Design a protein with these regions (language model features):
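Short acidic, S/G/P-rich loop/turn micro-motifs used as interaction or catalytic elements
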Residues: 95, 160-165
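Glycine-rich phosphate-binding "P-loop"
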Residues: 49-68, 157-159
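A short, well-structured juxtamembrane/interface segment
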Residues: 59-85
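Cofactor-binding loop segments of dinucleotide-utilizing enzymes, especially the Rossmann-like FAD-
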Residues: 91-93, 117, 186-189
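Structural motif
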Residues: 87, 153-155
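Short, glycine/charge-rich flexible loops or terminal/linker lids adjacent to PRPP-binding catalytic cores
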Residues: 107-153, 164-168
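Short glycine-rich phosphate-binding loop at a beta-alpha junction
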Residues: 84-92
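PRPP-dependent phosphoribosyltransferase catalytic core
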Residues: 2-57, 83-84, 101, 105-108, ...
Length: 274
């Protein structure tokens, strides 16, 4: 019998609907190394396995680029200075962390509030934006912006602009009087999606991948490879990327079995606390 980790997503009826091509350039954001070291220690077996996993991912340096938080933050800062914003809205935990990391270097975001949002597969090949808290996006924004003067500045902060679904939804739900004084900040994104967001308000991005989304350029988080946070599905348990072997084959052809095995072992270590 195959391990539970291997079989968890094997019978998915929707797997073909979310096929991934092999991109010409794949960016992998390392949001895993520091977390593993902090949780289990830099000398732990899990930390050693994490280093081995990244060495494996980097075997194709012409096509796979590993990004660190620090270098992306510096690239955002290099785009130009800003006066402190009156309010910053971080999209999800990731956006909140980006806002905090930027503020630590610049002082731009003295007030940061999180919006509870995530993207979810609908099982039919599409994605929908859903709240992770018991309030709609409109209700969350109404609460955060209650009494917010139209003269004050607003920052909306996320980690990635991929399809642009999340950011466009947030911006289009903002009160019209607030949008003209809104600025988006993001660590990385697909250039065409960034351009679509920029039609709504100014955008500052650290790393912009040029070309067609998925085919030419793609972005993934390393945490999603290992932890069951990468794939969220409507009314079904979340999956890690390694539980969709066809995705790993597309992203890391020729070494997909090694990547899956390393991710599975690391997932087990993190689940067991060892």
């Amino acid at each position: 019998m195959p391990p539970a980790e291997a079989s968890r997503g094997a019978d998915e009826p929707d797997r073909g609907a979310y096929a991934q091509p092999t991109p010409r350039l794949l960016y992998v954001h390392d949001d895993l190394s520091d977390e593993v070291a902090e949780r289990l220690g830099p000398a732990s077996p899990a930390a050693a396995l994490t280093r081995s996993l990244f060495a494996l991912l980097k075997r194709d340096p012409e096509r796979v680029v590993v990004l660190t938080l620090a270098e992306q933050v510096e690239r955002v800062i290099a785009q130009g200075r800003h006066a402190p914003f009156d309010l910053a809205l971080g999209i999800g935990r990731a956006g909140e962390r980006v806002a905090q990391a930027l503020h630590a270097k610049t002082g731009w975001f003295p007030r940061v509030h999180r919006l509870g949002l995530t993207r979810e597969e609908d099982g039919r090949g599409d994605y929908h934006l859903v709240s992770t808290v018991p309030a709609t996006l409109a209700a969350q924004l109404a609460g955060r912006l209650k009494g917010f003067p139209a003269s004050e500045s607003l920052a909306v902060v996320d980690d990635t602009v991929f399809s642009g679904l999340t950011l466009r939804s947030v911006l289009e739900t903002l009160p019209p009087v607030v949008l003209p004084r809104t600025h988006v900040f993001c660590l990385r994104g697909v250039s065409d999606s960034i351009a679509a967001v920029a039609r709504l308000c100014p955008v500052t991005v650290g790393v912009a991948g040029v070309g067609r989304m998925l085919e030419d350029v793609s972005f993934i988080n390393a945490s999603g490879l290992v932890l069951r946070v990468g794939i969220r599905r409507r009314a079904r348990p979340p999956l890690a990327f390694f539980e969709r072997p066809q995705w790993i084959r597309a992203w890391f052809p020729g070494r997909d079995r090694e990547v899956i095995a390393a991710c599975r072992r690391l997932n087990a270590l993190l689940d067991s606390g060892g």
